[in-house]
């Protein structure tokens, strides 16, 4: 069975690269191209495996990374001497680095504008009340924002776990389950368990095809805001909860 699924929340290859740089605490001014290329291609492979609609710009960036990687492997040659008299070594990463820095600035400005818009929406004609202490305490306890890239990383990790635990002689039974049915199953399971469950526990004892459908169902539930995804810190376990429970 084919599951064609388009994820509109992906913002593009630069967004994915920034996610990887943040996730693995990479210096944006000194990008380890081999490492970042491997991680990037791994995400693309997972997206294709899940039959997500991967835009051509992702593939163009993959080709760009591979080209930069190959240039980095070549012996470095001294280029023309600048007016200052200093030798200049051309860095194949320079253009990509500049694009990432500019995109990061754009994202920061966009986030600030959104925050100001939200603050503006909370203004009333009544005298102002100082909520500073409450807001600081609340912010300290807020979980991280979980992106679709975080979900892909969690799915990759889970698939590796399953592969390492699966017996060599295991036979996969093909099961065809509609995504809509799996969405209903997940919501019912969350309700039964008090509205919250670990991401990995949802995939217990499932075969590969069912795992794929389960993951796509989770993405659909996220898109329709029927579930909330939480993660306390980077690389921590991800938890799912029903949106109606979370709002209570």
Swiss-Prot record:
Q: Which GO terms describe its biological process?
A: cell division; chromosome segregation; DNA replication
Name the Pfam families on file.
Answer: SMC_ScpA
Please provide, in alphabetical order, the Gene Ontology terms of the cellular component aspect for this entry: cytoplasm
Q: Indicate whether Cytoplasm appears among the record's keywords.
A: yes
Q: What InterPro entries does this protein's entry cite?
A: ScpA, ScpA-like_C
- Domain of life assignment: Bacteria
Which of UniProt's keywords are assigned here?
Answer: Cell cycle, Cell division, Chromosome partition, Cytoplasm
Instruction: Report the principal subcellular site.
Output: cytoplasm
Enumerate the subcellular locations listed in this protein's record, separating them with semicolons: Cytoplasm
- This protein's record includes keyword Cell inner membrane: no
Q: What is known about its subunit structure?
A: Component of a cohesin-like complex composed of ScpA, ScpB and the Smc homodimer, in which ScpA and ScpB bind to the head domain of Smc. The presence of the three proteins is required for the association of the complex with DNA.
Q: Which PANTHER family match?
A: SEGREGATION AND CONDENSATION PROTEIN A
Q: Which family does it belong to?
A: Belongs to the ScpA family.
Q: What does this protein do?
A: Participates in chromosomal partition during cell division. May act via the formation of a condensin-like complex containing Smc and ScpB that pull DNA away from mid-cell into both cell halves.
> What name does the UniProt record give this protein?
Segregation and condensation protein A
């Amino acid at each position: 069975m084919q599951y064609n699924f388009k994820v509109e929340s992906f913002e593009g290859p630069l967004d994915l690269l920034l996610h990887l740089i943040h996730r693995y605490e990479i210096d944006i001014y000194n990008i380890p191209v081999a490492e970042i290329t491997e991680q990037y291609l791994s995400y693309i492979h997972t997206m294709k495996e899940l039959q997500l609609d991967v835009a051509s710009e992702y593939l163009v960036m993959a080709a760009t990374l591979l080209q930069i990687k190959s240039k980095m492997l070549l012996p470095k040659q001294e280029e023309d001497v600048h007016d200052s008299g200093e030798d200049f070594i051309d860095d194949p990463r320079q253009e990509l680095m500049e694009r990432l820095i500019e995109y990061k600035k754009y994202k920061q400005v966009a986030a600030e504008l959104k925050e100001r818009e939200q603050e503006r929406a909370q203004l009333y004609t009544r005298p102002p009340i100082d909520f500073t202490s409450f807001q600081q305490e609340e912010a300290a306890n807020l979980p991280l924002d979980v992106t679709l890239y975080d979900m892909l990383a969690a799915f990759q990790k889970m698939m590796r776990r399953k592969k390492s635990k699966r017996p060599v002689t295991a036979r996969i039974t093909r099961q065809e389950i509609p995504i809509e049915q799996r969405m209903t199953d997940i919501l019912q399971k969350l309700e039964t368990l008090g509205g919250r469950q670990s991401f990995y526990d949802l995939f217990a004892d499932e075969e590969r095809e069912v795992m794929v459908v389960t993951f796509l169902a989770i993405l659909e539930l996220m898109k329709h805001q029927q579930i909330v995804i939480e993660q306390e810190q980077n690389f921590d376990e991800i938890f799912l909860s029903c949106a109606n429970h979370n709002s209570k």
